[in-house]
């Protein structure tokens, strides 16, 4: 799986979030390294700033999940 830095992953998440009216106000996505057993994603997000509405959070989770399977967090 291709690797990206935390800044690159955040930029990709923000690019996708900017396309939806419920999430376009988000300016920061905190990227957190995980240490999975097996082949799961090695990162997740921890915070959205500013926090969107409940509907926006659900949409953001879906959009960010689409990034999990495409890139791993670089060492």
Model-derived segments and spans:
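N-terminal acidic leader/helix
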Residues: 1-28
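Detector for the mature cores of small, proteolytically processed
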Residues: 18, 33-75
């Amino acid at each position: 799986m291709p690797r990206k830095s935390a800044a690159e992953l955040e930029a990709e998440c923000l690019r996708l979030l900017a396309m939806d009216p419920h999430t376009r106000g988000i300016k920061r996505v905190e990227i957190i390294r995980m240490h999975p057993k097996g082949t799961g994603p090695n990162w997740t997000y921890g915070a959205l700033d500013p926090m969107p509405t409940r509907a926006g959070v659900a949409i953001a989770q879906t959009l960010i999940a689409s990034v999990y399977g495409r890139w791993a967090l670089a060492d």
